[in-house]
Amino acid sequence: MSKQRIERVDSLPLIVYWLTKMRIQEAIDAIWQPHPYWQGLSYGQLAVLFVAYVLYTHTHRLCEMEDWLNSHRTLLEKLTGWRIGVKEATDDRIGHMIEIIGCEEEKAIRLQRQVGQNLIQAYALPTEIVRYDTTSFSVYHTVPENGAGQGILGFGHSKDHRADLLQFKQGLGSLDPAGVPLFTNTVGGPCADDPLYLPAWEEMVKTIGHARFLYVADCKAAALLTRATIDHKKGYYFVSLTHDWRNS
């Protein structure tokens, strides 16, 4: 006698629909191909399921995803059209997928660029104004054996006034007024903010396809090199000038 069970639907159809519309799977699978002996879903398919899991459960704990996936497996198979095995989402498989996607910065930037272009084209998003800003995140962590500053975590100027804590920095470029993210980058805690603004602008130019947008940023983007380069490449910027830059 077959067993019957109930699977909750909730917001999963909406989440999967938008991830499909953004073509996340196609963008990832075009850049990363799994090992020939890799079985089951592709990296792109696993990534879609992982993002759906994070958005649905509001957690990113890998150890719980296998049970979550199996409790929604029939629904997810209907929504995606994929055959999802019972062991597709073990923590080692998901961890391997995340490691592969995150270990090469150049490919990760290509992914951001492709997804950003898909969003702009699919929804005809306005690209007249783009914002970029950075922030720091303090963490309770032991100092790495090779010393602070050798990796992402390091000591630096803390906006939280906690010079005793290690930190890393995160930058985000987004479209106004919708706030749609186009570019993000993670850098080491000791890194200064000023040198990040020009590479971020150049990357968003590649994503949008031209430089004819207004680049809005804070005074750390007011360095003469940053402003001169944007102007030379026919771009526009709107930044606040500190006292040191008013005469430059």
Q: Locations of the language-model features?
A:
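Short beta-strand-initiation
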Residues: 167-169, 223
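Carboxylate/His-rich catalytic cores and anion/metal-binding grooves
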Residues: 157-161
